[in-house]
């Protein structure tokens, strides 16, 4: 499990080539799913179109559980993109991993904290952007001092804590799952006895990790809509 990350330095920036590649793979898979599902639309959906419409309704219900649809409808595409992209990203590293020259190339991109924290920061920025856009700068800034002005430092801590927990929750669950799968794979390759002892736990953990991957995508999307509602709804 002591694999190195393939790094690329561009000026003062350092990129993990594996993470960049896997993000592109996840984006391509999501694009293909969306393209195949919508290329021949029918009044009575079947197959992939039925699957895509189910996702759309599922995300719509998430939004409506947090804010009225008139306000939250603008976040529908964001929610669909998030839940599909994160679910695919969570599952990419489960079937196998690819190591070349002691460098790990194939993994779940969400097992990298820079990815999950970037997603969380993106949600933070978007929530503030829409808060200012829909409420106005003065009104929105005033919400940080309600109900009392001394709440302002606590509101700042809350913003930081929400972003941190949103990103690290996703990272921790996916990274821990891949670590345990790697340990079980190492046990299975140690010999016949190790293989027999590891095969059942590995299959069970694979199934559980798939479940966790979908659940974490749902949780991230749900919390995104909770944070958005908190910023843009008048009753928050």
From Swiss-Prot:
Keyword Secreted: no
GO cellular component assignments: plasma membrane; proton-transporting ATP synthase complex
Pfam families: ATP-synt_A (PF00119)
One of the GO BP terms on file: proton motive force-driven plasma membrane ATP synthesis
Membrane association type: Multi-pass membrane protein
Example of a GO MF term: proton-transporting ATP synthase activity, rotational mechanism
PROSITE patterns, alphabetized: ATPASE_A (PS00449)
CDD domains: ATP-synt_Fo_a_6
Membrane-spanning intervals of the chain: 18-38, 79-99, 112-132, 174-194, 205-227
Record keywords: ATP synthesis, Cell membrane, CF(0), Hydrogen ion transport, Ion transport, Membrane, Transmembrane, Transmembrane helix, Transport
InterPro entries found in the cross-reference section: ATP_syn_F0_a_bact/chloroplast, ATP_synth_F0_asu, ATP_synth_F0_asu_AS, F0_ATP_A_sf
Top-rank lineage group of the source organism: Bacteria
Coiled coil: none
Subcellular location: Cell membrane
Similarity annotation: Belongs to the ATPase A chain family.
Subunit structure: F-type ATPases have 2 components, CF(1) - the catalytic core - and CF(0) - the membrane proton channel. CF(1) has five subunits: alpha(3), beta(3), gamma(1), delta(1), epsilon(1). CF(0) has three main subunits: a(1), b(2) and c(9-12). The alpha and beta chains form an alternating ring which encloses part of the gamma chain. CF(1) is attached to CF(0) by a central stalk formed by the gamma and epsilon chains, while a peripheral stalk is formed by the delta and b chains.
Role according to the record: Key component of the proton channel; it plays a direct role in the translocation of protons across the membrane.
NCBIfam families registered for this protein in UniProt: ATP_synt_6_or_A, PRK05815.1-4
UniProt protein name: ATP synthase subunit a
Gene from which the chain derives: atpB
């Amino acid at each position: 499990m002591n694999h190195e990350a393939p790094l690329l330095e561009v000026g003062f920036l350092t990129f993990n080539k594996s993470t960049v590649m896997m993000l592109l793979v996840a984006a391509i898979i999501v694009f293909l799913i969306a393209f195949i599902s919508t290329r021949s639309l029918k009044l009575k959906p079947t197959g992939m179109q039925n699957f895509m419409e189910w996702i759309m309704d599922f995300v719509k219900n998430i939004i409506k559980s947090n804010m009225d649809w008139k306000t939250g409808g603008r976040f529908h595409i964001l929610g669909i993109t998030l839940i599909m992209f994160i679910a695919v990203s969570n599952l990419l590293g489960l079937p196998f991993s690819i190591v070349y020259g002691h460098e790990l190339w194939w993994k779940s991109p969400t097992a990298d904290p820079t990815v999950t924290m970037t997603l969380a920061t993106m949600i933070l920025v978007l929530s503030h952007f829409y808060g200012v856009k829909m409420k106005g700068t003065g009104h929105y800034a005033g919400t940080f001092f309600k109900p009392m002005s001394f709440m302002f430092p606590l509101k700042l801590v809350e913003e930081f804590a929400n972003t941190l927990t949103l990103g690290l929750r996703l990272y921790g669950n996916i990274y821990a799952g891949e670590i345990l799968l790697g340990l079980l794979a190492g046990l299975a390759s140690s010999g016949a006895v190790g293989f027999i002892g590891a095969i059942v736990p590995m299959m069970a953990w694979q199934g559980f990790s798939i479940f966790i991957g979908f659940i974490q995508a749902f949780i991230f999307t749900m919390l995104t809509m909770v944070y958005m509602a908190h910023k843009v709804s008048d009753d928050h």
